[in-house]
Amino acid sequence: MNRIGLIQPGRLGDIIICLPIAKYLTEKGYHVVWPIFSNFKTMIEESVDYVEFISVAPDVYLTVPCAYRAIMERYGSIPIIDIAATFPGSTCTKEYSILGDGFGEEKFDQFKYRLAEVPFNEKWNLQYKRNLEKENELFDKYVKEQNYDVVGLDHSQGRANFKVESKNQIIE
């Protein structure tokens, strides 16, 4: 089986958005080797069995060179798809910036899928293993009303500064 490396070591949302890329490559016969932030590795491995994940330090400034090195040390020279736009050391950051940093005509997820040569409609082919026992435990812990809204205000640049208002229970 041919190996291929995928460079997108983090943020969690980017990893989830790119999982269908790895699935597509796996279905095409590749053994996908994907360095990701060490603090995400166990969680992602519990849910995804079609990728070989490698831990790299969750330091945005060093992680891309470390990811390349981790692949090379383990497998030597194999093809690598770098889709880690905006991470220092990524080979695609310059093109990404020229195209509008994900806010131009081509959105950030479209950019990643194009570079990986994966049809964009594969984005919706997210496949993972579920743990219903843990899901129900979390549901029971947080959901206190029949109607609820789940919001995420934290992002890579900090925290969104606005008040969320709803007639429903708000789960942050």
Language-model regions, residue ranges each:
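Catalytic machinery of carbohydrate-active enzymes
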Residues: 1-172
